[in-house]
Regions:
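Positively charged n-region of N-terminal signal peptides that target proteins for export
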Residues: 1-4, 52
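Hydrophobic alpha-helical context, especially transmembrane and signal-peptide helices
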Residues: 4-6, 42
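Bacterial N-terminal signal peptides
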Residues: 7-16
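Sequence/structural signature of beta-propeller domains
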Residues: 21-294
Length: 294
């Protein structure tokens, strides 16, 4: 049953969403009290970071990717912002990559990348790519990829936020909507196969979240808390007393924390110390953890 979730309603002074104006603002604000341990993602490869995931092969490493316009490629960085590796997905087209997530199945580190952007809501289906996480300290070509073609049950949707829920083995997708009426969907991870094959699935809609312009989501791998991010705030939904029910969890009143004033935050990931890390679009973009003590 679809549940209407009234977690929070944000009221805007105008109907125009004002996005952070320049990369110089990122650098000026990167040392504000809103974020800690801020570094810059150095190099010319990443100029529109749209997804972020903590490596489960090396917890000192991060994976990210560009938005549309790049090759089907991931980049690995250390906590100093230096690139340590990259990964090319063979035979995959990057139409509009918007998010990624890391997780483990039976001790095997995995990554999922979502080609799910659809600003005009015209795509008949989207793609999720699941594969074993490569070494973040090397350059790797990946050809064993589980390709999941996903159709929404209620028509085309623009989505920029996905996560993996370790307890249910579901991939979580949350719609990006200008209105605070974002659809919440899940896709069950297919069983592992020695030879991955393309599959087609219909996502299950499990609820509606009253937060507009959602750009990122991640699930704490240890306690199951869900972090939802839009351009201005982060929302932490505690898993306590929800019995692993995603809709019930996202129906709770969240803790709300203002984001740093960076150019355009579209990527977030939770580490194993329950810290939420963020990055922004733009060349030499900041990477830092949200200050949870404010």
């Amino acid at each position: 049953m679809i549940r209407s979730i009234f977690a929070i309603t944000l009221v805007f002074a105008s109907s125009t969403l004002v996005v952070r104006s320049s990369l110089s603002d990122d650098k000026k604000n990167s040392k504000s009290d809103a974020a800690k341990d801020v570094v810059e993602l150095k190099g010319s490869d990443v100029n529109e970071s749209s997804g972020l995931a903590v490596s489960n092969r090396d917890e000192r490493r991060w994976w990210t990717h560009n938005d549309s316009g790049d090759k089907s490629r991931l980049y690995a960085f250390n906590h100093n912002g230096k690139r340590t590796g990259k990964c090319d997905l063979e035979g995959i087209k990057a139409k509009d990559w918007e998010d990624m997530a890391s997780f483990q199945i039976d001790g095997q580190p995995k990554l999922v990348v979502a080609d799910c952007g659809d600003n005009l809501a015209k795509r008949k289906s989207i793609w999720l790519y699941v594969f074993d996480e490569p070494d973040p300290n090397k350059s790797t070509d990946v050809d064993r990829i589980q390709k999941i073609q996903v159709t929404y049950p209620d028509g085309s949707r623009n989505c920029e936020a996905i996560a993996f829920d370790q307890s249910s083995k579901n991939i979580l997708l949350i719609e990006k909507s200008t209105l605070p009426l974002a659809g919440i969907y899940t896709v069950t991870l297919p069983p592992a196969s020695p030879r991955p094959v393309d599959i087609e699935v219909v996502a299950e809609r499990v609820g509606t979240l009253n937060i507009p312009m959602i750009t990122a989501v991640d699930v704490d791998p240890l306690n199951g808390d869900i972090w939802v991010v839009n351009y201005f705030q982060a929302f932490r939904f505690s898993r306590a007393e929800t019995k692993n029910d995603l809709a019930a969890q996202l129906g709770k009143l969240p803790k709300v924390i203002d984001l740093p004033k960076w150019k355009q935050i579209e990527a977030a990931a939770v580490d194993r110390e329950h810290q939420l890390w963020l990055t922004s679009e733009g060349k030499d973009a900041p990477l830092g953890r949200l200050n949870l003590d404010r």
